[in-house]
């Protein structure tokens, strides 16, 4: 109702809509023009307007010049688009569309010959549609008046004034002719108007007379037709009355004779029927007693059937209780099994590290197993489908039998109704033959119903026996069906998740391949650059070998050895780069293997599930294992936060970082700003480096970042599981522990671990020697990743227990946070003291972590060279003497070391 009310419009809205539609279609404009035309025609009537109006209309219609002017105005209004004024002007001036003169006719009236240039220009403008006739005429006239004084001296030309005077004279002549014609037309205008009025009056009188004659003729004819019809109907009614009276008399005589015969027959029949009715009453009473006894038997059988159904329901309930108990026992077994798994996983960690090299073989075996299991599952699905079809067929048969039971009940109710009808018929029994026939029909029906009842009772008994005692095979099939359906659903879900994960992994692998290719190209470029740099160093060697004669006897023994050390370090750096390229290829292959092993589907039960879970766990353990545990965290941070300069690559010890590790764009920008500030604040260092005898080779234009900033920002996201497990030391240990816990809680979800692009390019976590407690706290969480994936899909109770365990671990980590923070502060203080003692520059450079890192590297280098120093004391003295001479060069090398990594 509300919708109909909303759809219905008010009368005002309806008027507005009609007005808008008429306006858009142009009906309003046409109506307005018609009304204006009628008003103007009425106002122009000669009787109302008098002689002056008749003169004006005659002048307008008869004068050629006025019609030409009107047609020019009409053409101008039409070309300018003034339709409203045009609709008013046309009826007012008395011009119809047919009487409007064309532009050529107007030019002919103006006596402009077609050979004149004015005629040609006007016609061309009108045909091109640039402007109307009046506008083009005015333009030509203005152009003519503007250029009238122009004349060519080389040719004999006449002025345009004579032509203009001739035009004026022509217009005056036309006006005079127009006046003469107007005076002539005034005589006949009033006569024509009167003749038109007389014609109208005569036509109206003739029309009135014609209508009166037609009306009189129609009245006379209608009266005649009515009288004829009345006479015909009266004659027909009389004939029908006579026929009806004759037939009525004949029928009444026949009915009287029939009534007499019928009364006699009825008396005889009543005597016979009374005897038959008495005998039938006795028989019906006997049948009623037999029907009652059968009803009692049917009721007893129905009660027995209901009792058997109730017993069957109780059995089903007991079976459900048993199944619930079994489920509870299974859950308890699963919990105990989980605990065993947790204990066994701790033992298997060491074995899994050894099995890491055998992963490709295991992967191929797993693929073959998956294929075999897929074929087996397809076969089992076909068997299950066949069993389900059998089950549906049997259930349909049971439904049909139940329908037949209901139909038998409905037939029993129908029998009751028939019995009541029989009672009523016994009470109101009058017609003997009909009753006899009805009784015979009832007897036949009763016999048929008895047979049907007996058959259905036997059938029902057989069905109840079958239903009450279900077969053991049927129960086993139902249980297997449920189990197989659950397994099939799980397998489908796992296959879908595996497909999605493999698809995403494929995309990530493609992107990683592209990144690794670019990084390999960069490594090749670096090797080329190193080759060129070695050549430059050789040239520098030659120069330094030529220079000792100028420096004196002290530097002769030291400079060649120092230069040879630099060449050896450069060659070692080239070898390291080649090894790094090989490591890159190995890392890419191992990552492919890890990605495949991490995404294995958990389709199998028993030992196969454990093997897959441990394989994925092995990946996580290796990615989180404390490789390079002996290195400090500051060194690792500075190593991964900046790109190496060429001079640092020569002077630094062997690098421990893969070139595939990404460099953060924000860190690189920050580092560049810091270097710019340092160079601006310390110009003395730059001067010192430029004044040294041996120039420090620095190539800032050749610094190559491993990954561009755009690709890095797209590839690195903080939400990946590997990113969470391999965070830098810039965060506090408590934050690191929280991130590890969050990653373990995310990995314990039933969804498999997804590998993103930055996971492939992420460096391995460098864990210091004093952080084993963090890894020990995180290990049980990492061990539970894949078992939780398998168990969470089977039961929801295990997930709740896992959440409780995770909460306990979080509380444990929160308790350990203060202790870890204290140890971290102490370690930072110790590192600060070491760097302050070893730094050669002022206090401004001590706060710089890069300077600290370089000093630590120098200390390591000195420790490595300490046995050589003990053996050669004289060599050490020479180095000390040379260090005073080349202090500015050392400072320049230290500045170059800031750009290392």
Curated annotation (Swiss-Prot):
Its main location: cytoplasm. Residues 65-97 form the LisH domain. Residues 541-563, 585-697, 709-901 are annotated as: Disordered. Disruption phenotype: Embryos display several alterations during development including perturbed intravesicular fluid flow in Kuppfer's vesicle, convergent extension defects and randomization of laterality of organs. GO terms for cellular component: centriolar satellite; centriole; centrosome; ciliary basal body; cytoplasm; extracellular region; nucleus. Pfam families: LisH_2. Widely expressed. Residues 605-617, 712-734 have a biased composition (Polar residues). The modification Phosphoserine is found at residue 659. Residues 671-681, 776-788, 802-831, 872-887 have a biased composition (Basic and acidic residues). Keywords: Cell projection, Cilium, Cilium biogenesis/degradation, Coiled coil, Cytoplasm, Cytoskeleton, Nucleus, Phosphoprotein, Ubl conjugation. PROSITE patterns: LISH. Residues 164-512, 564-600 form a coiled coil. The keyword Transcription regulation does not apply. Component of the centrioles controlling mother and daughter centrioles length. Involved in the biogenesis of the cilium, a centriole-associated function. The cilium is a cell surface projection found in many vertebrate cells required to transduce signals important for development and tissue homeostasis. Plays an important role in development by regulating Wnt signaling and the specification of the left-right axis. Belongs to the OFD1 family. Homooligomer. Interacts with TBC1D31; regulates OFD1 activity in cilium assembly. This is Centriole and centriolar satellite protein ofd1. It comes from Danio rerio. The gene is ofd1.
């Amino acid at each position: 109702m509300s919708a109909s009310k909303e759809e219905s419009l008010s009368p005002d809205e309806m008027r507005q809509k009609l007005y808008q539609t008429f306006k858009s279609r142009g009906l309003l404009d046409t109506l307005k023009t018609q009304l204006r035309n009628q008003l103007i025609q009425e106002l122009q009537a000669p009787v109302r307007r008098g002689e002056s109006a008749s003169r004006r209309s005659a002048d307008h219609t008869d004068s050629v010049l006025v019609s030409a002017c009107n047609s020019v105005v009409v053409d101008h209004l039409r070309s300018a688009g003034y339709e409203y004024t045009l609709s008013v002007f046309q009826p007012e001036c008395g011009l119809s569309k047919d009487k409007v003169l064309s532009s050529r006719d107007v030019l002919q009236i103006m006596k402009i010959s077609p050979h004149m240039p004015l005629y040609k220009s006007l016609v061309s403008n009108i045909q091109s549609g640039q402007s109307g006739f009046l506008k083009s005429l005015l333009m030509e006239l203005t152009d003519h008046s503007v250029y009238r004084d122009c004349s060519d001296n080389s040719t004999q030309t006449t002025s345009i004034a004579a032509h203009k005077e001739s035009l004026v004279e022509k217009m005056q002549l036309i006006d005079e002719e127009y006046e003469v014609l107007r005076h002539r037309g005034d005589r006949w205008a009033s006569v024509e108007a009167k003749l038109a009025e007389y014609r109208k009056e005569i036509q109206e009188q003739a029309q009135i007379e014609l209508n009166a004659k037609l009306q009189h003729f129609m009245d006379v004819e209608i009266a005649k037709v009515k009288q004829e019809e009345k006479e015909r109907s009266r004659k027909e009614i009389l004939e029908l009355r006579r026929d009806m009276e004759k037939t009525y008399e004949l029928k009444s005589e026949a009915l009287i004779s029939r009534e007499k015969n019928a009364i006699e027959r009825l008396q005889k029949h009543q005597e016979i029927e009374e005897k038959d009715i008495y005998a039938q009453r006795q028989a019906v009473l006997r049948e009623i007693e037999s029907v009652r006894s059968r009803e009692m038997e049917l009721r007893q059988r129905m009660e027995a059937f209901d009792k058997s159904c109730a017993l069957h329901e109780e059995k089903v309930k007991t079976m459900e209780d048993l199944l619930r108990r079994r489920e509870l026992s299974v859950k308890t077994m699963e919990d105990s099994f989980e605990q065993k798994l947790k204990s066994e996983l701790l033992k298997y960690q060491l074995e899994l590290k050894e099995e890491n090299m055998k992963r490709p073989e295991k992967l191929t075996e797993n693929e073959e197993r998956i294929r075999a299991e897929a074929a087996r599952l397809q076969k089992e699905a076909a068997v299950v489908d066949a069993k389900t079809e059998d089950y549906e067929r049997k259930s349909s048969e049971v439904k049909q039998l139940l329908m037949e039971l209901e139909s038998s009940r409905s037939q029993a109710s129908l029998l009751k109704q028939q019995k009541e009808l029989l009672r009523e018929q016994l009470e109101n029994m009058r017609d003997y033959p009909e009753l006899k026939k009805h009784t015979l029909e009832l007897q036949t029906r009763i016999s048929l119903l008895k047979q049907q009842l007996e058959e259905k009772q036997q059938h029902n008994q057989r069905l109840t026996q079958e239903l009450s005692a279900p077969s053991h095979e049927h129960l086993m099939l139902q249980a297997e069906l449920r189990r197989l359906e659950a397994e099939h659903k799980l397998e489908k879900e796992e296959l879908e998740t595996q497909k999605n994960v493999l698809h995403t992994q494929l995309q990530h692998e493609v992107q990683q391949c592209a990144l690794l290719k670019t990084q390999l190209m960069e490594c090749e470029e670096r090797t080329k650059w190193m080759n060129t740099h070695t050549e430059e160093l050789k040239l520098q060697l030659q120069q330094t070998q030529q220079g000792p004669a100028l420096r004196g006897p002290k530097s002769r023994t030291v400079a060649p050895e120092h230069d040879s050390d630099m060449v050896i370090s450069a060659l070692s750096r080239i070898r390291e780069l080649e090894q790094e390229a090989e490591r890159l290829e190995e890392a890419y292959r191992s990552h492919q293997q890890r990605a495949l092993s991490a995404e294995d589907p958990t389709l199998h039960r028993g030992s196969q599930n454990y093997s897959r879970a441990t394989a994925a766990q092995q990946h996580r353990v290796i990615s989180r294992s404390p490789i390079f545990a002996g290195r400090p965290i500051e060194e690792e941070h500075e190593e991964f936060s900046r790109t190496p300069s060429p001079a640092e690559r020569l002077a630094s010890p062997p690098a421990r970082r893969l070139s595939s590790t990404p460099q953060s764009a924000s860190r690189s920008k920050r580092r560049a700003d810091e270097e710019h500030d340092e160079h601006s604040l310390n110009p003395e260092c730059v001067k010192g480096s430029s004044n040294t005898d041996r120039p420090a080779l620095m190539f800032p234009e050749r610094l190559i970042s491993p990954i561009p900033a755009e690709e890095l920002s797209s590839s690195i996201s903080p939400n990946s599981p590997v990113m969470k497990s391999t965070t830098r030391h810039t965060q506090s240990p408590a934050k690191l522990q929280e991130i590890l816990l969050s990653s373990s809680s995310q990995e314990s979800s039933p969804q498999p671990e997804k590998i993103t692009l930055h996971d492939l390019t992420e460096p391995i976590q460098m864990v210091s020697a004093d952080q084993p407690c963090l890894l020990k706290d995180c290990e049980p969480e990492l061990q539970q990743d894949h078992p939780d994936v398998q168990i969470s899909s089977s039961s929801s109770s295990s997930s709740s227990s896992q959440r409780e365990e995770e909460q306990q671990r979080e509380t444990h980590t929160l308790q350990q946070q203060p202790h870890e923070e204290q140890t971290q502060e102490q370690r930072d203080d110790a590192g600060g003291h070491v760097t302050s003692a070893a730094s050669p520059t002022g206090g401004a450079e001590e706060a710089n972590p890069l300077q600290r890192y370089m000093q630590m590297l120098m200390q390591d280098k000195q420790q490595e060279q300490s046995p050589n120093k003990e053996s050669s004391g004289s060599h050490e003295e020479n180095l000390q003497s040379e260090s005073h001479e080349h202090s500015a060069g050392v400072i320049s090398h230290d500045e170059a070391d800031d750009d290392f990594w």
